[in-house]
């Protein structure tokens, strides 16, 4: 028997459903990592979707070993540049920034985003970070990296997106040595993630503005005699007399979309350097041509085309093992209709 009581279909865990503060997503936690020092994550711009024909390598699957069609999302991932290194300490009140070191060799477009340091002594700042590590004050190190959308033809903007990405692996001394090595240099997705790995993708979803309770919460349209009151796409009532106010759990109209969402355990099917091999005839709708490095992610990714997408190693990977998928075909059929 179906469930009779169905006040809403949406989760209250995301309330209040308001617009994201920034189109650049933020991570509050990172997965454990025990390998060599590396930057945990990367960022790119969503291009669109296509499909591939690959061999099903999922054990115990009814189609194991057979060719299956899989939808994929294309994310263009040009090299990012490390602008600085930030050291965090931790006390009873939580994490807080201690000190940081910036490079002076920055792209001119970054000045559109922040006030870039002009008379910054990079060597002295790095020594201050190393001293804080030696004194045991530092708990974590983060790389301050920014994207380079000015190198993309499909993203019509010049302003880079700046973000923090944790440096993990080895001891703190190894991490600060690695941070000093990559400071001011480019990093690529191939150095951080590998084909077949499971990742988490985070982006700000497509904004839909103000929507009613039927679309926003999935409540039913009024039926039969209930619709004779003149309104159909509304809720039955706003709640009891007492408490003498409208509770926040009541499904009402309001902002829908443009909220940060994370989807877990997405598999990387391919990392490529030449976007021409996956660009359909006429280009991707609402994006255009992919000319540089790209990544194919199984399934969908939040947000519209051209939206910034952050990628990190899966934090809830479970028993998934890294297996290189066998892709036999990538659809480049025109999407123009």
UniProtKB/Swiss-Prot annotation:
It comes from the Archaea. GO terms for biological process: translation. InterPro entries: L3_arc_euk, Ribosomal_L3_dom_3_arc_sf, Ribosomal_uL3, Ribosomal_uL3_arc, Ribosomal_uL3_CS, Transl_B-barrel_sf. Residues 1-28 are annotated as: Disordered. The keyword Chloroplast does not apply. The keyword Ribosomal protein applies. GO terms for cellular component: cytosolic large ribosomal subunit. It holds the Pfam family Ribosomal_L3. Gene3D superfamilies: 3.30.1430.10, Ribosomal protein L3, domain 3, Translation factors. Keywords: Ribonucleoprotein, Ribosomal protein, RNA-binding, rRNA-binding. One of its GO terms (molecular function) is rRNA binding. Belongs to the universal ribosomal protein uL3 family. NCBIfam families: L3_arch, PRK04231.1. One of the primary rRNA binding proteins, it binds directly near the 3'-end of the 23S rRNA, where it nucleates assembly of the 50S subunit. This is Large ribosomal subunit protein uL3. The lineage of its organism: Archaea, Methanobacteriati, Methanobacteriota, Stenosarchaea group, Methanomicrobia.
